[in-house]
């Protein structure tokens, strides 16, 4: 099945929404750096990698006592498997927040298996045409046990049908890909779906004290907060009611139907 890549319905600019000051984890000394990616440390067992091809596409290395998870693989990072092996000696499990070129680019070919949300399976032939490894499907609500550390899988459709957020309840943060926090939201589904996703995430953040969601394009100060998730609910409801209307721009719309700010 051929799927139109970037079948975007709307672009929600979220940069002006209320959010508290945040510590940047990109200011310290890099633990790894080359021309394609830079890794900085978030805490003792968590790192963020910043690619340089598509708006600072971000990948995250999350380590437990038994294994580590690599969340996303960037656009095109040569020898990514060898790079992460210089940071952790634990076996690596590759998971994807969603199947788009800047998150499941050519570096996925270096890994024997990848875990994705089945909602994005139709994107695989176009986005990962040369991947020969095993593609395994995540289950909503499952826990990935890394040994002394767990990530809960939360399906968060909106940016894509198979967008996924990974929540570390004990650390009080998560990793949301482009579902939340990337400075804007490219929405490929309807606003009712987005509202349901945001309401679910808001409840999770409230119940478990989740302070931040690290996004798929991290600039140091744009980790998503509960307040901004709630703001997205309000904005989406205003769009549905007609209180807020999108507009077409005269410049290049990059395939977008409307811009909503």
Question: What does each model-identified segment do?
Answer:
Residues 1-22:
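Bacterial Sec-dependent N-terminal signal peptides
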Residues 21-39:
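N-terminal low-complexity, Pro/Thr/Ser-rich intrinsically disordered segments
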Residues 33-86, 165-178:
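Conserved beta-strand hairpin/beta-sheet module of binuclear metal-dependent hydrolase folds
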Residues 42-48, 141, 150-152:
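Short, hydrophobic/aromatic-rich segments at coil-to-beta transitions
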Residues 47, 93-95, 115, 136, ...:
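Hydrophobic/aromatic beta-strand patches that form the interior of the parallel beta-sheet core
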Residues 68-70, 76, 150-157, 161-238:
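Metallo-beta-lactamase
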Residues 76-146, 238-241:
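Active-site HxH/HxHxD metal-binding segment of metal-dependent hydrolases
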Residues 247-261:
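C-terminal regulatory/interaction regions
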């Amino acid at each position: 099945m051929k799927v139109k890549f970037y079948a975007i319905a709307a672009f929600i600019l979220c940069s002006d929404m209320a959010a508290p000051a945040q510590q940047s984890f990109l200011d310290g000394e890099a633990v790894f750096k080359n021309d394609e990616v830079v890794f900085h440390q978030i805490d003792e067992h968590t790192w963020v990698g910043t690619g340089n091809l598509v708006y600072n596409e971000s990948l995250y290395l999350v380590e437990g006592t038994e294994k580590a998870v690599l969340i996303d693989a960037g656009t095109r990072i040569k020898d990514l498997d060898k790079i992460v092996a210089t940071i952790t000696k634990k076996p690596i499990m590759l998971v994807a927040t969603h199947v788009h070129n800047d998150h499941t680019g050519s570096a996925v070919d270096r890994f024997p298996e990848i875990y994705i949300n089945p909602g994005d399976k139709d994107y695989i032939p176009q986005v990962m045409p040369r991947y020969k490894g095993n593609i395994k499907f995540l289950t909503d609500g499952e826990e990935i046990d890394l040994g002394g550390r767990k990530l809960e899988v939360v399906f968060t459709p909106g940016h894509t049908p198979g967008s996924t957020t990974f929540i570390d309840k004990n650390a009080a943060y998560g990793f949301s890909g482009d579902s939340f926090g990337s400075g804007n939201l490219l929405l490929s589904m309807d606003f009712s779906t987005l509202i349901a996703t945001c309401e679910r995430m808001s409840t999770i953040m409230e119940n478990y004290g989740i302070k931040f969601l690290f996004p798929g394009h991290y600039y140091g100060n744009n980790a998503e907060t509960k307040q901004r998730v709630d703001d997205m609910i309000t904005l989406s409801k205003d769009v549905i009611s007609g209180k807020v209307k999108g507009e077409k721009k005269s410049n290049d719309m990059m395939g977008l139907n409307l811009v909503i700010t």
